[in-house]
Amino acid sequence: MIKEELNLWAEGVEFRHLDAYYNFILSVLNFLCIKEYELSVILCNNEYIQKLNGEFRQKPEPTDVLSFNYFEGSEQINHKIQGDIVISLEYLEFSSLEFNVEMYEELQRNTIHGILHLIGYTHDTNDFQNETMLIIQERVLRETRRVF
C-alpha cells in the first residue's frame, strides 16, 4: 500500500500561506517522482531550530533547514520519504536579504533542499555549479511553479 501523508505546521511563527505551500510541496514530490511519503514540515523561528540544531548536530546556533530521515536504508538515493523537515522562517528572512531573493523563493529552495536530503542526496560544499544535489535543487526550483 502506498502511503501519502504530508503534515505542515508553524511553531512560534505566523504563516498565512499553508495551503499554497502544501500544494507547492506536493508539486515538488511529484516532480521528483516520489510516490510514497510520510513527511512533516515544521516552519519555525530561530530559537526552535537552534535547539534542534544543538541537540542533533551539536551546533547550538540557528540554521535555515534541518532534515530528519527516518527511512531505513537512507544511505542511497531512494524515492520514498519518511521524515521531517524543519525550516526557520526567521533565518530565511535574513538569508533572502543576503542572497537578494524573495523570502518565499528562499522558502521554496530550502524545502526542496530538505526533500533532496530525505531521499538520500548530500553535498560537501555550497557550490551551485558543481554539487549534483544543488544543481538538481535549482532545476526543481525553476521547474516547479511559483505559488506565492
Swiss-Prot record:
Binds 1 zinc ion. It comes from the Bacteria. It is found in: Cytoplasm. Zn(2+) binds at H113, H117, H123. GO terms for cellular component: cytoplasm. PROSITE patterns: UPF0054 (PS01306). Transmembrane segments: none annotated. Pfam families: YbeY. Keywords: Cytoplasm, Endonuclease, Hydrolase, Metal-binding, Nuclease, Ribosome biogenesis, rRNA processing, Zinc. Its cofactor is Zn(2+). The keyword Cytoplasm applies. One of its GO terms (biological process) is rRNA processing. The keyword Ion transport does not apply. This is Endoribonuclease YbeY. The lineage of its organism: Bacteria, Pseudomonadati, Spirochaetota, Spirochaetia, Spirochaetales. The gene is ybeY.
